[in-house]
């Protein structure tokens, strides 16, 4: 696409970053200064009844700056990158039609990638293949299947945790159905985003600062009633750790605690560690992201001015 074609496209803003980096605060500040409407790009915030453990914007924050694509699914329901792309494109079109600018904010980098580059031509799920994989897992364990994936598709295996059965199963399923690896197929892009996108990433200047923010926020969540929130979900009886909602960082560790598998202190330790690992994965995505302008979490005024300056140019 040449520059003239790009200028003809309506503007959009991406505010990306690791967990606990200040994305929400920056986006709300931008809502006060620019003609923007916010769209959440977060695979955890889509779930109803999961407010504290996902650091969902508060009622006061949502009153200041409403977010679209929050609270759109029950925790028992699934939601894919394809679902997100379809929903986000509709919200963006509605915002643009109203003469305003879509501002997409969140940390689910797979969603941002699906929106920006389109979706790869992955095969549909095959229940028989999936059942065969799950049978193998029950006999050999997911660790053995992860080793199998490491031989077939080492890039995907390095990215997928051995304790993530959904993503591990999907990577193997794609190979067994198509004969091509997930890594090969995801290099083939689909329809690109029909917007002129200003892309920003916000993060603290050092990993140590980010780790401190993550630990502080996890304790703030506990003080705010995270355990009680998780217990309501636990007591429903229809939710389990194979569901994406319950595998969300923090909830998975809380589930182990509520099940009696680990004690409270271990839950806190594991929850903080898992959140740091999530932030590390998010930062890895972002460091390989092209056309992104970095902002410093610890200089919110400068970050705000930088975005306004670029978007208003």
UniProtKB/Swiss-Prot annotation:
Positions that bind ATP: 17-24
CC cofactor: Mg(2+)
Q: Which InterPro entries match?
A: Dimethylallyltransferase, IPT, P-loop_NTPase
* Residues that, per the record, bind substrate: 19-24
Per its record, the protein catalyses: adenosine(37) in tRNA + dimethylallyl diphosphate = N(6)-dimethylallyladenosine(37) in tRNA + diphosphate
Which residues make up the annotated site Interaction with substrate tRNA? 108, 130
Ranges for the region named Interaction with substrate tRNA are: 42-45, 166-170, 247-252
Q: Which family does it belong to?
A: Belongs to the IPP transferase family.
Oligomeric state and interaction partners are given as: Monomer.
Query: PANTHER family recorded for this chain?
Result: TRNA DIMETHYLALLYLTRANSFERASE (PTHR11088:SF60)
Q: What is this protein called?
A: tRNA dimethylallyltransferase
Q: Which gene encodes it?
A: miaA
